[in-house]
Amino acid sequence: MKTNRNRPINILIVFFLLTTARAATRNWTNRTHRTVPKVQHAYYAYPHRSCESFSRPYARSMCIELERIHRSSRQPLFSPPPPPTEIDQRYGVEKRLVPSGPNPLHN
């Protein structure tokens, strides 16, 4: 008789465990997707509002296309640092680069 009284409690406990496990897995998948940065290619980025000033559809589409081309062809603003200079121990000055191989000016 004791088992019949505990049956609703057991069902509620199992239901609670299943819902918390499902919520935990749902949060885990959302968390992993949120940490991955969304990198959108510049070509597919939303166009600037300046193209909305064109009333003709052809001019507006050309403006959007030119903005996409311009946005995707941008170069990074920083350049790599120059290599460190080497000091020649013999002369105490900076080493110079000397080309190797045959002289291209000599026939």
From Swiss-Prot:
One of its GO terms (biological process) is regulation of cell differentiation. Residues 1-23 form the signal peptide. GO terms for molecular function: receptor serine/threonine kinase binding. Residues 87-97 have a biased composition (Basic and acidic residues). The modification Hydroxyproline is found at P99, P102. Residues 73-107 are annotated as: Disordered. Keywords: Developmental protein, Differentiation, Glycoprotein, Hydroxylation, Secreted, Signal. Glycans are attached at N27, N30, P102. This is CLAVATA3/ESR (CLE)-related protein 10. It comes from Arabidopsis thaliana. The gene is CLE10.
